[in-house]
């Protein structure tokens, strides 16, 4: 009710969090990433965006091949993994999760257009977690997304999975990069980086690749 009232930011603050027990028994904390940041497919502003404070215990690759053709909307994670993650949220949470429209980049030899996806949960973009398109010697193309204020430093981006250090994917292809085969990710120390031909990788330099998602309510 508060989320839908338009007054959520008078009751809560960025960083406030709630604990959710998934249907699988996995326990995750979700923190307020920002207020009035995201929009529905119809362009209506959504009151609250939440971000996972831990990465999910089951990680993996972002795509079935080393390719960024089609971008995040066409990647294996979004098509084959994300639906089961959303369905594992408790019903009372699924009932208040609001579909958001998210921008990303489809990067191939044909260009790097902005493409959209409409989902109840999603991978964050590099720009949403660092607020820039150039970082630590790597870069991505501007998809129009903006920083969530919960991400203010490398430390704020560090996530654990199964109680151990991990790296986690963003939905942003590395670019310019003429192999068209890599996504940006958050390293175990919280730095946003990329690597060569990584889209089908399940580990990065010995560290497991995992999923840390955002979603909207209200």
Residue ranges of model-derived segments:
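Collagenous Gly-X-Y triple-helix signature in extracellular proteins
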Residues: 1-218
């Amino acid at each position: 009710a508060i989320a839908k009232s338009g007054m959520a930011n008078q009751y809560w603050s960025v960083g406030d969090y709630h604990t959710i027990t998934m249907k699988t028994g996995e326990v995750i904390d979700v923190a307020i990433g920002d207020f009035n940041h995201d929009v529905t497919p119809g362009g209506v502003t959504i009151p609250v965006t939440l971000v996972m404070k831990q990465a999910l215990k089951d990680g993996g690759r972002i795509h079935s091949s080393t390719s960024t053709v089609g971008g995040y909307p066409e990647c294996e994670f979004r098509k084959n993994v994300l639906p089961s993650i959303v369905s594992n949220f408790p019903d009372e949470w699924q009932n208040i999760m609001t579909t958001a429209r998210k921008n990303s980049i489809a990067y191939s030899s044909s260009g790097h257009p902005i493409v959209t996806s409409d989902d109840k949960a999603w991978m964050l973009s590099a720009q949403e977690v660092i607020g820039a398109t150039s970082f630590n010697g790597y870069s991505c193309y501007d998809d129009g997304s903006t920083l969530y204020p919960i991400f203010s430093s490398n430390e704020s981006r560090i996530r654990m999975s199964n109680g151990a250090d991990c790296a986690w994917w963003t939905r942003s292809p590395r670019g310019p990069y003429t192999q068209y085969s890599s996504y940006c990710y958050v390293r175990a120390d919280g730095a946003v980086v990329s690597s060569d031909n990584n889209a089908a990788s399940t580990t990065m330099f010995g560290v497991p690749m995992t999923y840390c998602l955002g979603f909207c309510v209200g």
